[in-house]
Amino acid sequence: MTGLFITLEGPEGAGKSTNREYLAERLRAAGIEVVLTREPGGTPLAERIREVLLAPVDEVMNPDTELLLVFAARAQHLAEVIRPALARGAVVLCDRFTDSTYAYQGGGRGLSLERIAALETFVQGDLRPDLTLIFDLPVEIGLARASARGRLDRFELEGREFFEAVRNAFLKRAEDDPARYVRIDAGQPLVKVQQSLDTLIPNLLELSRG
């Protein structure tokens, strides 16, 4: 039995975590096993790598170092959480996955997409999400929401130009593979966003039941 791998992507302040919980609640109400996880992180070791990636420090992190840390955390996450959950038939809802690497390290940092793709294949093999939800909103709204949450992490401290590149990278990936991606207008009030998610539930239930 093979599970269903759904990733939630988008820039800062897009509401991915809140809406991941909402989707999980709806699927569990229908009797579906749901595993909630996130990247970077998802296991104790991967969460320690997350701390290194997000903590503001005086030393400038080399973009290649950042990229390798992201994939190191992902390798552990896949081995310990994602692959076992999918193998037993669960629905995995993951807050960020490799699309964020293409957006942040590729779009934001300007790293080679070919290099990212090579690491993607090395770490993931042929595993790709079954469905990716892109929670999209204007950069200024997302940054205002992130600032309202309190102390900013190392990525949230980046400037508007960085986040415009991140947003554009997400949208380009969705445009290039419309069969896998669904864009959600995350600039709407939460109730409207969740109404958009409600329209996806019947299809998700059908997919999760094979």
Swiss-Prot record:
Q: Which Pfam family name is an example for this entry? A: Thymidylate_kin
Q: Which catalysed reactions does the entry list for this protein?
A: dTMP + ATP = dTDP + ADP
Q: Does the keyword Oxidoreductase apply?
A: no
- Residues where ATP binds: 10-17
- In short, the EC number is 2.7.4.9
Q: What class of enzyme is it?
A: transferase
- Sum up the protein's function in the record's words: Phosphorylation of dTMP to form dTDP in both de novo and salvage pathways of dTTP synthesis.
The record's section on NCBIfam families has: DTMP_kinase (TIGR00041)
**Protein name (record):** Thymidylate kinase
Gene coding for it: tmk
